[in-house]
């Protein structure tokens, strides 16, 4: 499966033991939201893209220029893996292995996977890691995810990293559900800022989250009023 994948480099960057951050779409899109903010705030360069057989033939247009859907942005310290499409479950295992294989020659300091867990709220960020020593370090920043199941790229990437001798952690933000959750993304960024001194601005994400929450509250109130009115006018149908 890995043989049918390819990474095409589009820029030459002199890396200095970079941190590789996987920010593919998942629950609440929290990883994608955080990844996009890092790319924007750190002004990362378009580094290259993945060719993966069988993924959606979608092309992203930014300022009139087309980009492949699964791509990477970087500077000397960070490589952000970003995708505009949800990766098929049948491709995840092979792609995780290919990611480790592709970036192993960049002498990465650490692999980080960003994801979400459905909790009906957006408060905590949990951590997982592929080594006991990393777990101890994570405890300084987040609560450890003791038991459960992790879907998507995250768990697979940590296992493939361990198989190949690379350190890897996963950060899992609580999220309200399947809709985009900027507050969950902001919570991830808050942890990443502390861990890696990113200094990424999260105020805009918080404002966006508050706007979404206020709109949902307004819609809920309208729905309750409508239901109350319906009960009075048409009691036999409620």
From Swiss-Prot:
<keyword id="KW-1003">Cell membrane</keyword>
<feature type="transmembrane region" description="Helical">
    <location>
        <begin position="141"/>
        <end position="161"/>
    </location>
</feature>
<dbReference type="InterPro" id="IPR019151">
    <property type="entry name" value="Proteasome_assmbl_chaperone_2"/>
</dbReference>
<feature type="transmembrane region" description="Helical">
    <location>
        <begin position="79"/>
        <end position="99"/>
    </location>
</feature>
<keyword id="KW-0472">Membrane</keyword>
<dbReference type="GO" id="GO:0005886">
    <property type="term" value="C:plasma membrane"/>
</dbReference>
<feature type="transmembrane region" description="Helical">
    <location>
        <begin position="19"/>
        <end position="39"/>
    </location>
</feature>
<dbReference type="InterPro" id="IPR038389">
    <property type="entry name" value="PSMG2_sf"/>
</dbReference>
<protein>
    <recommendedName>
        <fullName>Uncharacterized protein MJ0106</fullName>
    </recommendedName>
</protein>
<keyword id="KW-0812">Transmembrane</keyword>
<dbReference type="InterPro" id="IPR004425">
    <property type="entry name" value="MJ0106-like"/>
</dbReference>
<dbReference type="Pfam" id="PF09754">
    <property type="entry name" value="PAC2"/>
</dbReference>
<keyword id="KW-1133">Transmembrane helix</keyword>
């Amino acid at each position: 499966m890995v043989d049918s994948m390819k990474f095409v480099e589009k820029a030459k960057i002199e890396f200095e033991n970079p941190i590789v951050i996987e920010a593919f779409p998942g629950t609440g899109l929290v990883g994608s939201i955080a990844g996009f903010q890092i790319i924007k705030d750190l002004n990362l360069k378009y580094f290259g893209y993945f060719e993966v057989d069988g993924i959606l033939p979608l092309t992203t247009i930014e300022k009139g220029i087309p980009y492949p859907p699964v791509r990477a942005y970087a500077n000397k310290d960070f490589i952000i893996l970003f995708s505009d499409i949800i990766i098929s479950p049948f491709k995840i295992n092979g792609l995780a292995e290919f990611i480790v294989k592709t970036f192993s020659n960049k002498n990465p300091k650490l692999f980080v996977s960003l994801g979400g867990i459905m909790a009906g709220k957006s408060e905590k960020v949990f951590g997982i890691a592929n080594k006991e020593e990393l777990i101890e370090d994570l405890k300084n920043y987040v609560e450890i995810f003791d038991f459960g199941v992790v879907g998507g790229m995250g768990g697979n990437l940590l296992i493939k990293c361990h198989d190949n001798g690379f350190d890897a952690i996963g950060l899992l933000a609580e999220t309200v559900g399947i809709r985009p959750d900027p507050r969950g993304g902001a919570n991830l960024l808050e942890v990443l800022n502390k861990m890696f001194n990113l200094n990424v601005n999260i105020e805009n994400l918080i404002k966006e989250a508050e706007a979404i929450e206020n709109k949902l509250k307004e819609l809920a109130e309208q729905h309750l009023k409508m239901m109350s009115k319906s009960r009075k006018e048409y009691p036999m149908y409620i």
